[in-house]
Structures are given as structure tokens and as C-alpha cells.
Amino acid sequence: MWSVSVSPSVFQGIQGMSLSVRQAACVRIQRGMCVCPAGTVAGLGVEGVTPARGGPAGRGGGRGLRRFEEIPHTGSSGWLNLVKFWREDRFKLLHKHMERTFNTLGPIYRERLGTQSTVNILLPSDISELFRSEGLHPRRMTLQPWATHRETRQHSKGVFLKNGAEWRADRLLLNREAMMAPAVRRFLPLLDEVARDFCRQLATRVEKEGGKEERGYSLTIDPSPDLFRFALEASCHVLYGERIGLFSTSPSQESQKFIFAVERMLATTPPLLYLPPRLLWRLGAPLWTQHATAWDIIFSHAEKRIQRGVQRLRSTQAAGGGSGGAEGEFTGILGQLMDKGQLSLELIRANITELMAGGVDTTAVPLQFALYELGRNPAVQEQVRGQVKAAWARGGGDAHKALQGAPLLKGLVKETLRLYPVGITVQRYPVRDIIIQNYHIPAGTCVQACLYPLGRSRDVFQDPERFDPGRWGTQESGEGAGGGGGFRSLAFGFGARQCVGRRIAENEMQLLLMHILLSFRLSVSSSEELSTKYTLILQPETPPRITFSTL
């Protein structure tokens, strides 16, 4: 298996479009250009930001309510801003751009990029106000390129792309099989099995390829390809109730192709968010073709897995066993949904495909960051390992009991995602007018909490540069405490619209980290923080090399 880090030049992407698209974009840029109060054309970035007159007013700052138009912004022309992003290749550093802009403009600002317009916030008290206004059917920004792919290919949409009552009905059914405690107890042993197999295979490799040391063997590798295989193997085991054999000596080429397609899909999404995807589809723009082809591969691979699972479950039914299989046998989320019969097969297919596509990079990449941080923080590593060993002994090797007795494992995942959130924003469209930082924000405005600057803000965290899983057992912890005291850990979203695969991902990462810490000591050659890039998810600029030493 290989891990491809795709970071295409977005500006090259638009150059590959037809002349008519470029001309249309340029016309819209010229028409959208406006003059700021200072008498200059609004730019983008520190040198061109446009703060409100008098600076931003905080909540309770003694100023009267201010108009929406007075919110500090990065430039009035979305198309001009977008071209500057392309020319300066800012998409891959969008998280850094957000951090710099907050440092310049204060805790709230507006931004227009192409067709998108958002209000960006980062303080927990403001995020609390936003989530209080999300309503019964919370909405987040629709990834229009994904939706256009479903529509042009006539695929049904899963809950990720739905809104309103239809979203809520489907989501409640999925919660029972993916989020609730009984569901977690059913699939936890499957995740544990894959995590144990991963560590056994890694131990064999370390002893075979590594150097002999006084206490055992040691091997330095880039673990990212193995972590991607682990993530796909684990998620498929939970979704379909069977292994797909990615730990064999000759893993499936189809599965490797699937992983590559997921990365290509993620890499081509950001530039398409700010352009009209249906127009690009009609014109056959190269950027759109790459994106759609990646999704086609994802759907094709998932369809084969789903069809295989459906045939297996129907054979079991014909034999009188029901979709649930033999007594006590877990047949995966696919089998559970089919057994309940409350979702059509087409909707099951749409949601299983979304879960499968969303379950690879979003767990493999945080695991890279977690292993690196443990390697460059040996004292933290020993602290977590000590708690894990004690919990493992008390639980008699029972994974569920061990996780319950090792809260630092959960803190380790939360701390990793604080510094390196997979998705760098969480959006909502308030159903009523709200006031944030003394600014009036109309209902229906896209407001997004920016997680990367949130996790590194000194106004929110003590010593934010320090990697400290133990901080989540203190007063800093919480995801929804009253008065905005929580809302510091939002990597999986919040409330009814949080990530539907959250419990799978959390337990998958905690279990693998637990077994790695029980088996290996980790070290790295550098104590520097990893450089990062944004390709719809945050990931290392270069995958880190980790030294695994047997205990």
C-alpha cells in the first residue's frame, strides 16, 4: 500500500479550465471589486485586512450593537480574494491564514472566497452562542462538489449531504448502529482484533528488519502506509462484519486504489468549493474530472463490498439465520441496518459509502500526529504507558475495561486533535438572528468555528504549545459546559450534527495507541513540531518517521 500526498496547484487547476470559464471568473472579479473605507481596494491577508472603524468590540465591551457590515473582513470581493489565494497557493495553508487573520482582526471576521461567504469565530463563548441557535435540523456548509457528483451520477445522498427532516430521520436510525453505547459494545471487539493484528505484524517486522539493541529490537519507518491500511481494515470490519485482508503479504490492489482515490478526492475538493461545480461538470474542466473520477472509484469499490455483504446476509437469511447471523455474531453496521429494514437499500448504500470514504484519512492522519507527539515527548509517553499498563492488568486483557481505566488515552486523542484538527472548521447556519462580539448576525448566515486557531489560542488554553493529554482531566475539559465553558474540543463537531462515525474513530484510535504503547517505545529524531498542510483535512507536510523499539 502507498500513501499519496496530493497537493496540486489550485491555480494550475483553473488554468486547465476552458477559456470561457476563466473569462467569466475575471468579469465577476472586476465587477465585484469595491473600495474599502480607507480608500483602498480590499486585499487578502495581513496587509489587506479591513477592520471595523474603532476595532472589534467584545461582548460586554460597552459599545452599542453593531451592524453586520461592520464586522472586520479580509476584502469585499470574493473573486479577487479567490484569485489571490490561487496565485499565492494559500489553500494548503488555510489554517495558518485563519490564525494570522484572527491575530490581526480579533476574535471575529468575515471572509468571501468565490461563491462562499462566512463569518469566522474562535472563542468558546461565541461558539456556544452559535450552537444554541442551530435549531432542530442543524445545517453545515454543503460540500457542493460532492453533492454535484451524487446528482450527476444519480446516486442517493447520505446524511453528510442532507438537511432538514429527511436528514434527521436517517440520522436517528444511523445513530443506533454507530453512536449509541450498545452499538459501541458490539463493534469494539472487532476494532480491538484489528489493532492487535496490526501490532503483531509490526512486532514481526521490527524483529526481522530492525537492529538488535540491549533491550530488544528497533526499527525506524514511515508508518503512514501501514496506518492507512489499518484504518481501512478496521472501518470495513465494523461496516461489513468481515476482514478484507490488508495485513496479508499481498494486500488487495483494489483497496490500495481506493485509498489513493480518497486522497485524490480530498485534495481536489478545496478549490472546487469556491467555484460553480455544475458549470465545471458541463465544461469537462480537468479539476472536476479528477474529482469525479476519484469519487467513481470510491463508489465502485464500496459497491463491491456492499454487494458481497448483502449476498452473504441473504444467504444467512435463506438458511433461517436472519440478517443478524448466528446468535451473538455481529454482522457489521450493514447487517444491522438491513436487519432493521428501516432504511432502503439505496440509502444504506449511500451512507455506508460515506462512512467508508470518511473512515480512512480521518483516523490514519491523527494517528501519525499522535505517534510523533508521543515520540518527541517521552515523559508524556511514559505517563500514558504507565496508566495503560495498570488498566490493562486490572482489566485482565479486556479492551473495554482497559479503555475505561485509562482516561489519558482519551486525553491523548483529544490533545492530538486540539493541535491538529482533521477538519479545521465546524459550520452552522443560525435559525435566528444572533449577537456575537456585539455584532448582529442575521439568521441563515454561514458562521464557522475555526478549530486550528482555537486549539492554539492563549485566550482559551494555558500554554497551548505544550502537548499535555492530562489537561483534559482539568477544568479546561468539556465540549458543552454551561456559559461557553466548554466548546474547546470540537474535532468531531457538536450535538445532533456531530460526526456519525465519531465512536468508531475514537475507539479505533485509542485501541491502536493502547496496543502500540503496550508493545513499543516510540522515539523521533527531531523535537520540532511537524509542518502541516491543508487538503480538506489537516495532515503533515511530510509523513514523520518513527522509531519503534520493542519493550
Language model region names:
Residues 51, 55-89, 94-190, 194, ...:
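Cytochrome P450 substrate-recognition site 1
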Residues 1-67:
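N-terminal mitochondrial targeting presequence
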Residues 362-374, 512:
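Short, small-residue alpha-helix embedded
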Residues 84-106, 300, 396-437, 458:
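Conserved cytochrome P450 K-helix E-x-x-R motif and the immediately C-terminal K′/meander segment
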